[in-house]
Amino acid sequence: GPSIFTLKHLEKLAASDYNGAIFTSDGILIDALKHGVTPEKFSNYYCLSVDGNSEKIWKWYDDRLVDQYANKIKFILNSTVAHNVYQRIKEVGGEAYWFNAMMDYWPGQESITRVMSASLRGPRRPNGLVRIATAGNCGASLWIQACSIFRRFTICLIGLDMGYPDGMPLEQTYYYDKLFKAVQGNMEFVKA
């Protein structure tokens, strides 16, 4: 979120003597690298992607710094991530690790998560992918995965604003255009 810039968290992290793991969301990856939060300084470096929108997410990977550092970053990818992003990560030497975001109560017979998990089984993964509650955004998903998968319990969260800044017009939010189209311009329905 915006606090990562207003509070200069990236600059502080880059200048620190912190020697633990870095878990970054895809949306902040390029900025983190530009500010010196790189896998050269922090050797356990992870980047998570959950978004399946191939147009919006691409810009977070289309940079020379991603080219330079991808082979030192472990990319944690949701099974629904945009295919062009996965191709890009492979192209620049990044290592991909997969998970399946839980969409609903997965043991239920009509569960979307259950169907997705079944479709992801194969000879290499007879049980499918690990299922993880993601809380609907990269930051919260990273927090959950840092604890539950990577067993990191001392965590400093930066830039996890859990929403948009106060006063931000709805029209400037990230998926406004898609929402506007989905409700056929009837934004009163959304504001209610």
Tell me what each language-model feature is.
Residues 1-192:
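Metal-ion/cofactor- or nucleotide/acyl-coenzyme-handling active-site neighborhoods
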